[in-house]
Amino acid sequence: MRWTPSVLFNQIKYCCGNQEIEDIDIDRQSKANTFDCFPLMFIKNNDIPKKEIPGLANFEGNCYLNSILQCFYYCKDLTNFFIKKENEIIKKGGKLSNAYLDLILRLNKKEKYNDAKILLNTLKEVSYNFFKKGGNDPKAALFYLLENLHNELKEQNLDYNEEDICCEDIDQEKAFQKYKKNEENNKSIISELFNWCLLTKNECKKCKNFHYICESQNNILISLNKYETENKNVILDDLIKFYFKDDEKHFICNSDKEIFKVKFTKKIISLPQYLIIILNRNIIQFNIIYEDCIDLSEYCVNENNVKYKFIGASLTNDYENKEGTHAISRCMTPEGSCIFSDLITMKNCKDINEYNPYILFYEKMQ
């Protein structure tokens, strides 16, 4: 069973105080190929839709990716940038930039159905990991979207070679200064709002020693929030799955029920306007207390005491436990916190799809 518009709409009614709202009447069978993917958006009491919510029409079964795209739409700084730069992007922008601009303009019309086909087809053309054999990989498309929008919009290319600073007599201060220089020449609206780089302690391929190197920008953002599990203090980014272009160069934290291990030592260099936290779905096997996850959904604070407000989430469609297969609804309260309708019961899961993690979006509070 997959989540349906009526399930989601009932959640919205609940989080808005059970107000009397006319239900959505959608015949799913008659719209099998255009099943609505409703947006994750701020729902205000005075503008709750009476009959329907504008959203993205589904494309090749990719409602999960559509919810990610709608989260990006509600990152107002990014959306406003594309709207203000519309003419310039049309004239000088790359293929992906223009496709993303098209999506924003469609969503801006607030129509019932919006087609993300142009953007999704562009991703399909150039991202080898987007459509995998046997299913889609929306997480790969998310990384590709951020990385390549950055590459198309940045002022100049990053002049960086890992081997330049990866050697036996590595000078960490020089490595840091080289990163700062590269950072100045590698800015775009994407890097300013989303990407921070990390100084990563990693094994050198040449000398086999561990050194601090500058991690490339195709790593998605992480957060250093902490929360309590069963008598354990766990760093949230221990649960993050890193994705690299090269399938052989990927990192998934090795964890068990007794102890959480992290391969990399991380250091924040700068603070972004937005956080994107990717939780590997396998964390549900580690006896995480999900009430803590719900608490974190309202806001989070990083190690520098900068507070971020939750603005959206993209959650997996379904899961299977001892009682059968259930759906997780995607929606938000008027205050901006997320409703994880079935998340707590996921301790009973038996079969977990590896493609769809939980992706949470936060915006820095003023």
Where are these regions (language model features)?
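Intrinsically disordered, low-complexity regulatory segments in eukaryotic proteins
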Residues: 163-183
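USP/UBP deubiquitinase core
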Residues: 2-5, 12-168, 276-277, 361-365
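Short, recurring structural edge motifs at helix starts
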Residues: 188-192
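Structured, charged N-terminal subsegments at the starts of enzyme catalytic cores
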Residues: 103, 202, 207-210
